[in-house]
């Protein structure tokens, strides 16, 4: 009983659990007034996230180094935090053609679409789920919890830290247990939600903004983009094929037919096609350049250009 009392007291002190003064009469407002209020609250998030940019940049560098060394980025969270983790991780394979960005959600995959909040309190499950991933010194683990005290996530981060992985806490409340358990923290103090305690709102939005920066920033540092183009896009359907062709046209200056031919000759590998077009080299040489540059597209183009035959024959 004492434990429950302490938990309740600690929870009520969190800023994300407190009542938002501007929303006291939420149920009496018109639809437009509700929309304006939520929009106004959301408008504060960019500035809140901006104050954490140095820590976000540190996370980008850590993740890029981990992925460059063959390690993984693993997100872990419960409830809404786990779902936004899954969303960012799921977008990395089609966008960057990498499968080493993964997620763990309390309650397992079924929790993505159903209520499994009871799993949030299961520390043992958090440790076990993390242990199954066998985290180590080459990995970066990001624990996401707006409160900074979710038992599942806290236990997972503690286990990962013990195993030698680099750990990062992403939370909305400073000085939390999760922050203390990790190597460092990214804190976005969004304040009280429009709907008191509903961290699926500002807290989740701010955290998705942070995850966008970390994953996109790390992939950019690794050279998995070219300029601001998704050159690692996987053309698995017609829409993505057209996108890949458009990217090749823009990046290389080639016409549509030449871009399509290069994409076909590359076996559907957009970066290979770009190196072929930009450096005017055959497929094998483009593949070799990308391998030598560890997938860094701009460096691969430079390498292939230096070694291209004078005739430029393909």
Model segments located where?
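Aromatic/hydrophobic pocket-lining residues that form π-stacking "cages" and hydrophobic walls in ligand
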Residues: 62, 156, 214
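Short, positively charged patches
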Residues: 17-20, 57-61, 72
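Short, amphipathic alpha-helical interaction segments embedded in low-complexity terminal/linker regions
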Residues: 213, 218-314
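Gly-rich Lys/Arg/Thr-decorated short loops/hinges at beta-loop-alpha junctions or inter-strand turns
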Residues: 37-45, 103-114, 226, 253, ...
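Cofactor-/ligand-binding subdomain signature composed of acidic, glycine-rich
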Residues: 2-48, 52
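Glycine-rich phosphate-binding loops that contact phosphosugars or nucleotide phosphates
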Residues: 73-210, 218-222
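A short, well-structured juxtamembrane/interface segment
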Residues: 51-66
